[in-house]
């Protein structure tokens, strides 16, 4: 039977100094011997998805104390990708994932905590904490801040824009048909509440996937930040984590540990949910990196296999203008998607979670489309938006009149009535991306699933934006944005502004954008990222020249540069003779912190995680 990790600092004569310090935090004799639960919060006033988290740690802490544990809260950083977008700040976004993972590990191990509650929400925070939880492998529960409500506005002529999000503000900004007054109205209306942006962008995708992996409670991914019902998730997380700690430390039950829950089968199920719901392409990076910490061998080939066999059941903004996270919730959230996949034989039932001994037990209680869902499930998924601008959580007691259980035409469809037989994400390969590239097919009109056009090559996101706004980009072009990979950027910038500006100028369905960088979960259109190897590693994307024909064939999972091999070899020799693989005309200040990340960053095809062997040999 494992001893409490915290006994290292709370027991024995030699630990008098440590106990003295614990006492100074408010602990008493009765607390020594109870499980110490670390609460990793990520409150910050920089990020709407985190601005409301300040007091939520106390809700968890009170529940921990009431269940017989000792709660100790700390904070970690959180970068807002939307605010950091389009300038040098985006270089720091992906590297922050590693900083978050390290900071959680440092705090938990330095203080010998016994269990962990992760209060996350936005893009790199949930994956960073997930990496840490799997690395630490102590009883852990995830509970995120919840999704933002979609916006509403009335513009010139009394036209009602009934559903808005951040991307609408970006695209309107470059649309010459949108007046300054209407742009101002859209800007003020697009992000009306606290919470992670309202579509199936990276933050909400990852919060849904922690639920699918089994490390979060039902409803974690879809319950709005403003919903009163969300408060109960924080209370239950505090109660549950103490129960998990007791099962492990008092009963030697290793089934409660993150690596037991996030098994190979659980990761396959998570990828199935990901492609079924058309999640952000960033999820591929994050799940690959998390799988490394879980000791689970997952490759892009595995993801490709899932994407070919699992149908696209759900299209949410930015892939749709009809559905947002509040609609996913009304349709039953992740339990409903898992339920449809289970009925289609597309998930492995032999998995368990922090809250259920099996997938069947989970779905029997929480799938509102099942035979006999629990009253708790019916109550939770009726939670509706409040429609009031606020930065405070839990204020809405509004309820949907009915749930959306329409499996034919509703937000979440059955396998029989899927949007497409293939999933919402696909892995492409070819001579332009020998190690793979990723595209969110749920956001690509089927008319663009095959595309051929001349390359227009730029070597930074900023240059891509300039080319789009200055009308250098024409319909039919394939924009190549290179040297923006994990090492080449460094930091693998997101290309949200280029895709949003293409859309705003009416070129979204007429162009393709290919990069060794990545895309925001808010991107849509024929946007192919994670091209591997990246240009800085000598990948073929470094060899592309203006005017080269590029061919994309999503049904065949191909992406090819239509240039003879001999010509490509000659270009490679020329580059290597002139100093190797680096951008020719880019001025960018790269800090020591970013250089340190770049020195250890691996390929996007392996999650862009760090590998210390790159510097230690």
Swiss-Prot record:
Binding-site residues for Mg(2+), renumbered to this chain: 81, 123-124, 494
Cellular-component GO terms for this entry: cytosol
Residues the record marks as active site: 520
Residues with the N6-carboxylysine modification: 124
Keywords (A to Z) from UniProt: 2Fe-2S, Amino-acid biosynthesis, Branched-chain amino acid biosynthesis, Iron, Iron-sulfur, Lyase, Magnesium, Metal-binding
Any single GO BP term: L-valine biosynthetic process
Cofactor note as given: Binds 1 [2Fe-2S] cluster per subunit. This cluster acts as a Lewis acid cofactor.
SUPFAM superfamilies, sorted: IlvD/EDD N-terminal domain-like (SSF143975), LeuD/IlvD-like (SSF52016)
Enzyme class, spelled out: lyase
Statement: the UniProt record of this protein carries the keyword Iron: yes
Pathway annotation from the record: Amino-acid biosynthesis; L-isoleucine biosynthesis; L-isoleucine from 2-oxobutanoate: step 3/4; Amino-acid biosynthesis; L-valine biosynthesis; L-valine from pyruvate: step 3/4
GO molecular function: 2 iron, 2 sulfur cluster binding; dihydroxy-acid dehydratase activity; magnesium ion binding
Cofactors (names): [2Fe-2S] cluster; Mg(2+)
Known catalytic reactions: (2R)-2,3-dihydroxy-3-methylbutanoate = 3-methyl-2-oxobutanoate + H2O; (2R,3R)-2,3-dihydroxy-3-methylpentanoate = (S)-3-methyl-2-oxopentanoate + H2O
Subunit structure: Homodimer.
Protein name (record): Dihydroxy-acid dehydratase
Organism: Parafrankia sp. (strain EAN1pec)
């Amino acid at each position: 039977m494992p001893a409490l990790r915290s006994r290292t600092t709370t027991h024995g004569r030699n630990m008098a100094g440590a106990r003295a310090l614990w006492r100074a935090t408010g602990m008493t004799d009765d607390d020594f011997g109870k499980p110490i639960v670390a609460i990793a919060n990520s409150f910050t006033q920089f990020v709407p998805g985190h601005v409301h988290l300040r007091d939520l740690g106390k809700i968890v802490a009170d529940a921990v104390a009431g269940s017989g544990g000792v709660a100790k809260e700390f904070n970690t950083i959180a970068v807002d990708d939307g605010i950091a977008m389009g300038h040098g700040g985006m270089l720091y976004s992906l590297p922050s994932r590693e900083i978050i993972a390290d900071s959680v590990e440092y705090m938990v191990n330095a203080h010998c905590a016994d269990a962990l509650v992760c209060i996350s929400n936005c893009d790199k925070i949930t994956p960073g904490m997930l990496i840490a939880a799997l690395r630490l492998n102590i009883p852990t529960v995830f509970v995120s801040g919840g999704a933002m409500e979609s916006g509403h506005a009335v513009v010139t002529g009394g036209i009602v824009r009934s559903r808005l999000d951040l991307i609408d503000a970006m695209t309107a900004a470059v649309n010459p048909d949108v007046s300054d007054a209407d742009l101002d109205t859209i800007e003020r209306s697009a992000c009306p509440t606290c919470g992670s942006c309202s579509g199936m962008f990276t933050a909400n995708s990852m919060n849904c996937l922690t639920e699918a992996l089994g490390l979060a409670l039902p409803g974690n991914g879809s319950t709005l930040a403003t919903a009163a019902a969300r408060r109960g998730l924080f209370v239950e997380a505090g109660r549950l984590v103490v129960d998990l700690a007791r099962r492990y430390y008092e009963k030697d039950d290793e089934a409660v540990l993150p690596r037991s829950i996030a098994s190979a089968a659980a990761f396959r199920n998570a990828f199935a949910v990901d492609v079924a719901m058309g999640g952000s392409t960033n999820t591929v990076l994050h799940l690959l990196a998390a799988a490394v910490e879980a000791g689970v061998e997952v490759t892009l080939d595995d993801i490709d296999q899932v994407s070919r066999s699992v149908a696209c059941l759900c299209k949410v903004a930015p892939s749709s203008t009809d559905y947002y996270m509040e609609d996913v919730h009304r349709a039953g959230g992740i339990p409903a998607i898992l339920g449809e996949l289970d009925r289609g034989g597309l998930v492995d039932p032999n998995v368990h979670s922090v809250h259920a001994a099996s997938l069947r037990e989970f779905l029997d209680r929480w799938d509102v489309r099942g035979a006999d869902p629990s009253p708790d499930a019916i109550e939770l998924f009726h939670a509706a938006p409040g429609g009031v601008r606020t930065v405070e959580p839990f204020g809405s007691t509004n309820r949907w009149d009915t749930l959306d259980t329409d499996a034919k035409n509703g937000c979440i469809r059955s396998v029989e009535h899927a949007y497409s037989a293939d999933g919402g994400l696909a892995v492409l390969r070819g001579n332009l991306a020998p190690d793979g590239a990723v595209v969110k097919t749920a956001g690509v009109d089927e008319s663009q699933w095959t595309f051929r056009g001349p390359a227009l090559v730029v070597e930074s996101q900023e240059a891509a934006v300039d080319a789009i706004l200055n009308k250098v980009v024409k319909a039919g072009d394939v924009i190549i944005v290179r040297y923006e990979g994990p090492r080449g950027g460094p930091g693998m910038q997101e290309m949200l502004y280029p895709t949003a500006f293409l859309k705003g100028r009416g070129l979204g369905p007429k162009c393709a954008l290919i990069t060794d960088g990545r895309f925001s979960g808010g991107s849509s259109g024929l946007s192919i990222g994670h091209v591997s190897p990246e240009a800085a590693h000598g990948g073929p994307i470094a060899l592309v020249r203006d005017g080269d024909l590029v061919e994309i064939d999503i049904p065949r999972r191909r992406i090819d540069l239509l240039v003879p091999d001999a010509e490509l070899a000659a270009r490679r020799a020329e580059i290597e003779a002139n100093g190797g693989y680096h951008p020719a005309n880019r001025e960018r200040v790269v800090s020591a912190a970013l250089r340190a990340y770049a020195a250890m960053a691996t390929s996007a095809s392996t999650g862009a995680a760090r590998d210390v062997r790159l510097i230690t040999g």
